[in-house]
UniProtKB/Swiss-Prot annotation:
GO biological process: thiamine diphosphate biosynthetic process
Catalytic activity field: [ThiS sulfur-carrier protein]-C-terminal-Gly-aminoethanethioate + 2-iminoacetate + 1-deoxy-D-xylulose 5-phosphate = [ThiS sulfur-carrier protein]-C-terminal Gly-Gly + 2-[(2R,5Z)-2-carboxy-4-methylthiazol-5(2H)-ylidene]ethyl phosphate + 2 H2O + H(+)
UniProt KW Transferase keyword: yes
Organism, scientific name: Salmonella enteritidis PT4 (strain P125109)
Subunit composition and interactions: Homotetramer. Forms heterodimers with either ThiH or ThiS.
Pathway: Cofactor biosynthesis; thiamine diphosphate biosynthesis
Protein name: Thiazole synthase
Pfam family, one: ThiG
Top-level division of the source organism's lineage: Bacteria
Amino acid sequence: MLRIADKTFDSHLFTGTGKFASSQLMVEAIRASGSQLVTLAMKRVDLRQHNDAILAPLIEAGVTLLPNTSGAKTAEEAIFAAQLAREALGTNWLKLEIHPDARWLLPDPIETLKAAEALVKQGFVVLPYCGADPVLCKRLEEVGCAAVMPLGAPIGSNQGLETKTMLEIIIQQATVPVVVDAGIGVPSHAAQALEMGADAVLVNTAIAVADDPVMMATAFRLAVEAGLLARQAVPGNRSTYASATSPLTGFLEALA
């Protein structure tokens, strides 16, 4: 069970809505993933119409919507987009994204922190997408963010947990949930994140661009469950030296 702010989730896999070939395929993949929290870019939906091709099936599916501010380049733009989303969707939950460079889509740490502080004061439940910077994540936590969402690698790159060392520090020091976001390309990346101690992962591109998104969504669901179970089971310690599982000493002595 995962708790963020005033909501609890059985699934530790969050999903996105971009890049799917159709709305129907998107919904089928989300259902297969077991995800209960789904992000959607406000620039891709008509917030005035609940029968929007993307929004309507999500509402029907009963998932928690997490509008994001993707496309915002400044704190001011993100705050304005957040206010529009709250008015249109009736939710104060927000994935805060500010990336001024469309080529790399890396989050702006200064604008993100500024916007996060302002939005928390306005009553938003803020989940900021940010770099894997332990100091920044701590600052975001201190201004009241409900979780932090550090990247594993650039958005849509499928590179995996390239920031593993920094993620480990963030996880160790965090007192709010840590959701690894961006760069997760295959289910084993998601399992690794949960094994490390992350509370959840957010996956979009890896599912949406797969030849079979529904099958890939299922694979991610199972991987997240496996990673969480492995962590709860408490793996054995790593060792430089070998340790035989079936020592021969007693056996050979008995034959002598």
